[in-house]
């Protein structure tokens, strides 16, 4: 399986994300924000964490209008897989590939620690390695991770089983404890916690590998 990991000015988790894909068995290509096309035959696009373009205007707003973002949107619209982590989640909401917005944390402070999550659905390639209700632990590192959406969007996410992860102890004020959501076709996932920072026991736990292995396995079955 082939993965492409985007690098924007200000990205700081792109190498971690590429390494996680490689550990799961993917052939990884790094792409630059000025590129106008994805590599031939890419199965999944990874949008990493960091502070793309310094978080100017809004987190992810400038990155969402970069040349490579247009190629990513086309990939998603064709049914391709996309994984956006932290700033990558913010980029996905700015592009419209995922609904809602990521606002300033309720406590108005940057949060950097490990959090416990509940796998809210196993019905996606990203989460199929777990059962709904399983607990996993990933790091978080964000200032603007407070997921916000209108009541209609929240009801749709619940009704369509598109909430992928929830916080067991909400650290940032996210509505309904939401930590990650899926697109309508379940092939785009955005989440604020960092599974790519939890792929080796030396990092304090390897729960994140469950996501990457499940994703590659799920894509292979399509």
Swiss-Prot record:
Q: Pathway, per Swiss-Prot/TrEMBL? A: Purine metabolism; IMP biosynthesis via de novo pathway; 5-amino-1-(5-phospho-D-ribosyl)imidazole from N(2)-formyl-N(1)-(5-phospho-D-ribosyl)glycinamide: step 1/2
Gene3D superfamilies per record = 3.40.50.880
Keywords annotated in UniProt: ATP-binding, Cytoplasm, Glutamine amidotransferase, Hydrolase, Ligase, Nucleotide-binding, Purine biosynthesis
> What is the protein's major site of localization?
cytoplasm
Q: Which reaction does it catalyse?
A: N(2)-formyl-N(1)-(5-phospho-beta-D-ribosyl)glycinamide + L-glutamine + ATP + H2O = 2-formamido-N(1)-(5-O-phospho-beta-D-ribosyl)acetamidine + L-glutamate + ADP + phosphate + H(+); L-glutamine + H2O = L-glutamate + NH4(+)
Question: Record's SUPFAM superfamilies?
Answer: Class I glutamine amidotransferase-like (SSF52317)
Q: Which GO terms describe its molecular function?
A: ATP binding; glutaminase activity; phosphoribosylformylglycinamidine synthase activity
HAMAP family for the chain: PurQ
User: Quaternary state and partners of this protein?
Assistant: Part of the FGAM synthase complex composed of 1 PurL, 1 PurQ and 2 PurS subunits.
Q: What protein name is recorded for this chain?
A: Phosphoribosylformylglycinamidine synthase subunit PurQ
Specify the species: Cereibacter sphaeroides (strain ATCC 17023 / DSM 158 / JCM 6121 / CCUG 31486 / LMG 2827 / NBRC 12203 / NCIMB 8253 / ATH 2.4.1.) (Rhodobacter sphaeroides)
Q: Which gene name belongs to this protein?
A: purQ
């Amino acid at each position: 399986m082939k993965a492409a990991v985007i690098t924007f000015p200000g990205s700081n988790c792109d190498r971690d994300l590429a390494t996680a894909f490689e550990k799961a068995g993917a052939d990884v290509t790094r792409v630059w924000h000025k590129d106008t096309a994805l590599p031939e035959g890419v199965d999944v696009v990874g949008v990493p964490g960091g502070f793309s373009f310094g978080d100017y205007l809004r987190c992810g707003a400038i990155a969402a209008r970069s040349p490579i973002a247009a190629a990513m949107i086309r990939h998603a619209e064709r049914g391709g897989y996309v994984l956006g982590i932290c700033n990558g989640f913010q980029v996905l909401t700015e592009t419209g590939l995922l609904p809602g917005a990521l606002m300033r944390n309720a406590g108005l402070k940057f949060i950097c620690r490990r959090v416990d999550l509940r796998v809210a659905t196993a019905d996606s390639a990203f989460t199929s390695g777990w059962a709904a209700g399983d607990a996993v632990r990933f790091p978080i590192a964000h200032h603007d991770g407070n997921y916000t959406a209108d009541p209609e969007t929240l009801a749709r996410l619940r009704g369509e089983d598109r909430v992928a992860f929830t916080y067991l102890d909400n650290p940032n004020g996210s509505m309904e404890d939401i930590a990650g959501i899926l697109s309508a076709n379940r092939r785009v996932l955005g989440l604020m916690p960092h599974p790519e920072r939890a792929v080796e026991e030396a990092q304090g736990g390897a729960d994140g590998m469950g996501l990457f292995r499940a994703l590659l396995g799920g894509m292979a079955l399509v």
